[in-house]
Amino acid sequence: MTKHPTGIYVGCLVKVIRRRLRMELKESVINYSPFVLQHP
């Protein structure tokens, strides 16, 4: 099986997007936690 450069590129892109989404989720949780604590 030969790996295509596009496949490797897409894999790296998915990794980066996942990492970015995870960071955004963490930031949103940190930003919204005070509102959740104020309004249970």
Curated annotation (Swiss-Prot):
Pfam families: YneP. Induction: Expressed at low levels in exponential and slightly higher levels in stationary phase (at protein level). This is Protein YneP. It comes from Escherichia coli (strain K12). The lineage of its organism: Bacteria, Pseudomonadati, Pseudomonadota, Gammaproteobacteria, Enterobacterales.
